[in-house]
Amino acid sequence: MKTLWQHCNVASMASGVYSIIEDAAMVTSGAHIEWIGRRSEAPAGDYAQVNDLAGAWVTPGFIDCHTHTVFGGNRSGEFEQRLQGVSYAEIAAAGGGIASTVRATRAATEEELFGSARKRLLSLLRDGVTSVEIKSGYGLDLASERKILRVIRRLGEELPVSVRSTCLAAHALPPEYAERSDAYIEHICSDMLPALAAEGLVDAVDAFCEYLAFSPEQVERVFIAAQQLGLPVKLHAEQLSSLHGSSLAARYHALSADHLEFMTEEDAIAMAASGTVAVLLPGAFYFLRETQQPPMEALRKHGVKIAVASDLNPGTSPALSLRLMLNMACTCFRMTPEEALAGVTLHAAQALGMEKTHGSLEVGKVADFVAWQIDRPADLAYWLGGDLEKRVVRHGVEVTV
């Protein structure tokens, strides 16, 4: 079924820049874009439907390429404690921090996890998100990681959003493996990843490379196991210290390395050579009141593609708005609105290995787009919060969230 969408301006984000088409039109056939260009040049045809977009600015559907949407419990109490002067170490010693989320997630049923994650994901969708990545990592044993990954798959089946599932079993050390991190890494590589991959629950594998998590040597073992299973890898790296995890990620041609506040220029050079995307997470930077910014000039200088994501998680970025992250990327990291928009479209698609089908409005790509009632594309990063008037189209069909 062919549909004509017209009376709009388009920021197609082809090549990662606005690539503006004024007074534009677009033809979709089924779930894909068949033609896009100036309205005066639109092909004549017997369209099943003609949609007037009322002068809207059309962008690709937003892609949130780094989230931890599925978890049990609530850590707003810790937020209060930290603001009253209790340190993160004291909270963790009392059983809080990530350990409390692991306990709550393990205790929750699959149905309970689905219900709470669905609400959070709907908030992202109301912001124009049409594709999302969701990580496991709050189970830290085979049964609980499987439970989370099954919920992630179900979210993609029941909501109007394309979902990529990432296994982050190497997120933290579970209590039953205290002081035995090498043994836990061996369990991930020999038992967890093969079983979960065999069940078709995993699209990519991630790990947390940090002094309070896992060493580069341990992460490399996870990467080798993932590659033996034919799975692409990603990495949380350089958030709190420099371990050159991003260079390790580049060596294994990772889809992305994420956070990166403490990365070096040498890391940026390695990522550029491997095509590894830098995923910046301004929500966590803001929420933790960090002061060390990612090396933006090094990333730009060496041509590293830069994505932006919500990092939605209960401990360090309880962010329910990807559009708010656009503003934070601009204000905290001095990105331009154009760079930030590329960060949640084409470069986010690249961070998920989806750039051939998603992330820009080009012939042959999937027809995921948002028609925004705004004056110019920069408005998407300019307005703080609120619900901008919009129409969301996924796979060529208008959806209501």
UniProtKB/Swiss-Prot annotation:
Compartments where located: Cytoplasm
EC number: 3.5.2.7
Residues given in the record as 4-imidazolone-5-propanoate binding sites: 75, 138, 171, 239, 316
Any GO BP: L-histidine catabolic process to glutamate and formamide
CC annotations in GO: cytoplasm
Family: Belongs to the metallo-dependent hydrolases superfamily. HutI family.
Described function: Catalyzes the hydrolytic cleavage of the carbon-nitrogen bond in imidazolone-5-propanoate to yield N-formimidoyl-L-glutamate. It is the third step in the universal histidine degradation pathway.
Protein's name in the database: Imidazolonepropionase
Species per Swiss-Prot/TrEMBL record: Pseudomonas fluorescens (strain ATCC BAA-477 / NRRL B-23932 / Pf-5)
